[in-house]
Amino acid sequence: MQLTIDLTGRDVLVTGSEKSARQAVRRYQRAGANVYRLSTPEGLPGDGQLPERPFLVAIVDDSGTGWLPLVERCRDAGIPVAFEPAPGAEGHVTLVGGGPGALDLLTVGAVDALPDADVVFYDRLAPCQELADLTSADLVDVGKQPGLHKVTQRDIEKLMVEAALLGKNVVRLKGGDPYVFGRGGEEVAACVAAGVPVRVISGVTSAISVPAAAGIPVTHREVSHMFTVVSGHAPLTEKEHTHLAGLGGTIVVLMGIGTLPQLAAGLRRAGMDPEMPVAVVERGYRPGQRTTIADLGTIETAATGCSNPAVLVIGEVVRVAEANRNHAEASAELSRLAASLLEA
């Protein structure tokens, strides 16, 4: 549960043990409240002075501690009471697929995992702009760009493991799906090797969702009954070009702008039709989303101004999107014409 209320300057009493109440304390502090603590119904020396009349009392569910008398006193005094969930088991890692970056494409599992985190290590392709609205955890940017890794993969794994071993609930938020060119397998292995409990929450992969944002289906009846997802981080070999060219279906390339010239030339050498349509979808589901369409013979020139993050789609399905777009534009033009005739 995240707070959308402004509690600036308000006194809020949060009950429960230090471990149980830690996330609730952060939430109310971020909402601007003056947070006071009551660890047990009788109080502990470390709790400090309590407010004479708090604006709100937050009761943290920590295994049946007897807070009922306090709740009843608050109700009698007209003091609002909020019931807060305790954090989950301490010291674990959750790998979360954040989808292509749009908040509404986060899974229910992702949204449920974020509030339970003490620290979130997030990538640049995850929906990071809205994170503060989804969790009160500490947010650590470990995002990588092609050719620029501010934090190395091994350092990311080390940070995750160290935080979990300190008893923190760690969320590793990644763009797309952790297991589709997301190095999720390596991060799971690092946790397992360190004895840290770990689970994976799948995400909406950009290999399907970003083409969809541009109206391109990766499969379409009687056009393509298969699709292949390829990493564009490194140039492919001639053998791989030949394999791809002979598969048929749709080819989806993630983060492939840097290697697009080699890929297009290699596929042509391998016998792919130079008139095969190619789409470059930049910044899918983000401000400035743009689609560039050309054929395999001219895509290097057409995509000169394109940049990552981008998804390449190679195949006849690109024509499906163009046909639908042309039909929609023609229908809109007919509607405008009909409206003008009625007004005449």
State each model region's role.
Residues 3-9:
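Flexible N-terminal pre-Rossmann segment of NAD(P)-dependent oxidoreductases
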Residues 102, 177-247, 290-293:
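Class I SAM-dependent methyltransferase SAM-binding "motif I" and its flanking Rossmann-like core
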